[in-house]
Amino acid sequence: MPSSPRNRRRRTCVALLSVAACIPARAAVAQERQDSVVELSRSTLRVGDKTIRVLLGRVVTGASVAREASFGSATWNGRRYRGSLDFVTDGDGVAVVNRVDLEEYLRGVLPGEIGSRDPRDRAALQAQAVAARSYAGARMGEHRPAYDVTATVSDQVYGGIAVERPETDAAVRATRGLVLTWGDRIITAPYHSHGGVMTAAPDEVFWRRGNEPWLRPVDDRSPDGGCYCDASLMSVWERRFTTEDLRRLIAQYGRDAGVSLSGDVRNLRVVSRGPSGRVTVLEVETSAGRASMRGNDIRFVLRTDGAILPSTNFALEMSGGVAVVRGMGNGHGVGMSQWGAIGRARAGQDARSILAAYYPGTRLSPLQ
């Protein structure tokens, strides 16, 4: 029998939606200069011990706030959510938090995270359901005061009822209650779009954190010599930055990455790479000196049209005042590659095999 995880006191997920003043059945929400309306259904939701709290948004307001509970669904800013809304005050204002059954929450997560897929990708969808449930379950075990997860890429993208799809709903049902565990602990199961030839160890990317035994570089090459991720349109990419682009980007975003240099950019240099080949340290030389940025911070500095760099798995060439960055993959690279999972599903692997490949040493356990 699979072991049962210990962090199982509650299974209700809370999502932050926004700040609001509450009125029976309707609540007006002020967001910047725009008025929004929260409409609450009058049906009753039985909130059990598998409810997660999802943060959907935040509005700073001086309005008085009341907590709403025991509603079947709610609409905020034109988007419907299952469960109920909590209006929570904290130091940042008032937060609208969606309290929803964990399995219902996943129905609003999978479409935004892995998209609508055809039947041959069924095993990948099931693997995604387990990974997303594990991620949420681990967050729920942290006992945050107001909410468990946000509804954005900071945690997992959650779109509510409008995004639900039959194929992703089926994946949630097929894996109901299953999470990944290490010993008696639910693991935080990160995932990303496309890992390239090899996924990353956490300290290659999230260098401020330590490694975990179930997260290590995984070779994603298939037996035919290709890569399981090859169906992705982001297998390879190229970005170009002039020295003026670099000066502007470093001035705007560099401080958060530990680069506070001013002046003209003279050079970018890869100092080190991790086991997966990703750039772990990138040196910037300007007329004012040198400084380095590390791991995933690099992606948030080297932006084009506001979009961060697809990954840190790249080669760099400086020529004629232009930095040419050629890379592969999309996302941080840690944990399960979603396109790799799709490729493995199309090659005949089931969800259990896919999860074992990307989270080695873990077990599938029932959430109780």
Residue ranges and their predicted role:
Residues 2-368:
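Conserved, single-site charged/polar hotspot
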